[in-house]
Amino acid sequence: MSLTDRTKPTDVSLNTDLYELTMAQGFWESGLVDTQATFNAFFRENPFGGGYAVACGMGQIPELVENFVFDDEDINYLASIPAPGGGSMFKPAFLEYLRNHHLDLTIHAVPEGDVVFPREPMVRVQGPLIDCQLIETALLNLVNFQTLVATKTSRVVRAAEGHPVSDFGLRRAQGPDGGLAVARASYIAGASSTSNLLAGKIYSIPVFGTHAHSWVMAFPTELDAFRAFAKSSPKNCVLLLDTYDVHQGIKNAITVAKEMEAAGERLAAIRIDSGDLAKL
């Protein structure tokens, strides 16, 4: 399962801004479709006030180009779009041109995971002007978000100084595809694992997880919950401390850790999910 398998492959052609198609129609009418062009993708400032960015998303560009076609359903939808001044947004002859059109592009990109800097090309797209224009939004959609996530993850990984970092961002990600993109970019940038099982399946990323506050709340006491989890998952026992009180949670985790050691097992880790770590 890859970039386009979640929907039908041709859906990527409509994953674009309307103005890419209106400009393409204008190029077609003006006889500029075969004019050779070069588009460069770059950014002006490093994100997060940092000194670098980490390039990501480029590995999915070849698949994007291969599947960037307009099928009958796409053409029918475009034909149904009205122009604000009346009539149809797109001319039938132009839509017929799109129906049989395939991109003919040469694309150069920095490798994923490379450090990049402002005002230098991350991706260079060369080919007929209309093709460069048609793919612009979809390509930037792949690269911009994943580069942002990879950069942030890289900063976290560096701050961790060799300790493993796991992506737990699915529940706050920008939808299902956003969750996949975050897991992919985080792994490329140095995260050791993800909580996202679908990303683990698709991209062969190691998966990792603990338990939630709801687990603790399901038992009479926090200590009961910790003991039950240690019994259920002795080889993957990470205890969440902050359901009620972090300091008491630490004491209960120590109790369970000693009990596990006596039984020949070992507490893997503890986790704090909220609050100000500096104050703790």
Residue ranges of each PLM-predicted region?
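Ordered alpha/beta subdomains of enzyme catalytic regions
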Residues: 1-235, 266
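Glycine-rich phosphate/ribose-binding loops and adjacent secondary-structure elements
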Residues: 214-280
